[in-house]
Regions:
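Basic, glycine/lysine-rich polyanion-binding surfaces/domains
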Residues: 1-177
């Protein structure tokens, strides 16, 4: 996965132009919006999640395999708006998914999240999102904090799976690959 943070005074208008889904639906709180990213002809380039971080600041998480294509698309559109892009090359994303995910999360963070809502502090962003169709969260941080969180979950006996397993779950849930 690829993490992009956006800055500037015209982010909402930028996102209205960039994606077909209505970004104004998530402006009232820290929430997420699933959306396709389209090319100029309306063809799908990728699926991504847009996160409202508060104060009209946004983050997009897209697929890693399309990060360069997406970054170029973001830059092209951003040049028409007062928007700067920060590709977070040191980002860590841990997808904690499955029926016990919230219980496992609560052993580390005492938070409750509704679907497509998020929590953020100085070190992490935790979003009630995921690409598996299962109950779960995605934990985004820098690489050092991500390793700390990863090691904690491994020490608790939580089993990691790879992208192939995640992609199988995506297919079962009817999500695009």
């Amino acid at each position: 996965m690829a993490v992009f943070d956006f800055y500037g005074s015209n982010q909402v208008e930028f996102l209205k132009y960039l994606i077909p889904n209505d970004v104004t639906k998530i402006l009232d709180s820290k929430r997420a919006l699933y959306s396709p990213l389209l090319n100029e002809e309306g063809g799908i380039l990728d699926d991504l999640i847009v996160y409202h971080l508060g104060n009209e600041n946004f983050r997009i998480i897209s697929n890693c395999g399309t990060r360069e294509q997406n970054y170029a698309c973001f830059q092209k559109v951003a040049s028409e708006f007062d928007v700067q892009i920060d590709f977070k090359s040191d980002a860590s994303i841990i997808a904690l998914q499955g029926p016990n995910s919230m219980k496992n999360l609560s052993s580390l963070y005492d938070i409750k999240l509704e679907k497509f809502h998020l929590y953020q502090d100085e070190e992490v962003m935790i979003a009630r999102t995921g690409y598996t169709g299962e109950l779960g969260v995605e934990i985004i941080s820098d690489a050092n904090k991500g390793l700390e969180i990863w090691n904690y979950f491994i020490s608790k006996g939580i089993q990691p799976i790879g992208l192939a397993a995640r992609d199988t779950l995506r297919l079962e849930a009817g999500f695009n690959l």
